[in-house]
Structure formats: C-alpha cells, structure tokens
C-alpha cells in the first residue's frame, strides 16, 4: 500500500490551507460538509491522525472516527428530517477511494430519493452554509 500523502486535500483542510464548511471538531476528528454532496446534508468525518484509509488507521483513531460519525448521523436525522442514514467508507482506488485520507460519508436519506452520482455537481456555498447551520444547531 502506498504511503500516506500529507499533501492530500483533507490534510490541507486540517492545516487550514483549504476552507471547509465545518460542522464538528474535537481533539481527534473533524466533520465538514461535502462540497459535491450526493444528498442534502452529506457530511465527511475525518481523523486528525494521518491515515490513508481503514487499512492503516489505528484501532483507537478509528474508534474516534466511528463515535464522531455516529454523533453526526444522529444530528443529521434531526437537522434534515431524515428517515435513514447511509454511512460509506472506501479504501484504495479499486475500492472507490478518491481522496487518500480516511473519511466516512454520512448521508441523511429520505424514502424514494436516490443519491446523486458521486462528484456530479458542486453545491452553492450559500446552500452549504445553511445546511451547516442546521447540522450545527442539531448537534447542540
């Protein structure tokens, strides 16, 4: 498996070099809205630890990501009046991974509404700001 690349986009977000629509941060994780969402409220949860994917993250760091993902999922159910949640994680290119920093996709779902194709459109910043505010309010 290739080594972790500290110049990946999510590492740059963690260092403040790239902006994001942050909804949650703690000592071990960061959660922010996907700028190319597959549904309303599509959130990414990442570890602050350098981890390429699920194959190389420590069990302790993965536990932090799992806890934060659950917290986001519960808040997203409320914030977006969802009827379910899809959580996805892709590892390595053959597994569908595009950004090589571990990330969990947390997507609020509604009956009969299909997910958009991956990376099919970039969401408007004002929409992302409004959705971030809803999720932040539900996290309180």
Q: Where are the language model's segments positioned?
A:
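HIT superfamily nucleotide-processing domains
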Residues: 1-140
């Amino acid at each position: 498996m290739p080594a972790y690349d500290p110049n990946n986009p999510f590492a740059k977000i963690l260092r403040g070099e790239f902006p994001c629509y942050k909804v949650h941060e703690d000592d071990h994780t960061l959660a922010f809205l996907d700028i190319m969402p597959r549904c309303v409220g599509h959130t990414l949860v990442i570890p602050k630890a350098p981890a390429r994917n699920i194959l190389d993250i420590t069990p302790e760091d993965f536990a932090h990501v799992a806890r934060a993902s659950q917290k986001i999922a519960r808040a997203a159910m409320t914030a977006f009046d969802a009827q379910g949640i899809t959580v996805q994680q892709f590892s390595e290119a053959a597994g569908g991974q595009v950004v090589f920093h571990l990330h969990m996709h947390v997507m609020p779902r509604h009956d009969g509404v299909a997910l958009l194709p991956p990376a099919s459109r970039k969401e408007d910043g004002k929409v992302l700001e409004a959705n971030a505010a809803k999720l932040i309010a539900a996290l309180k």
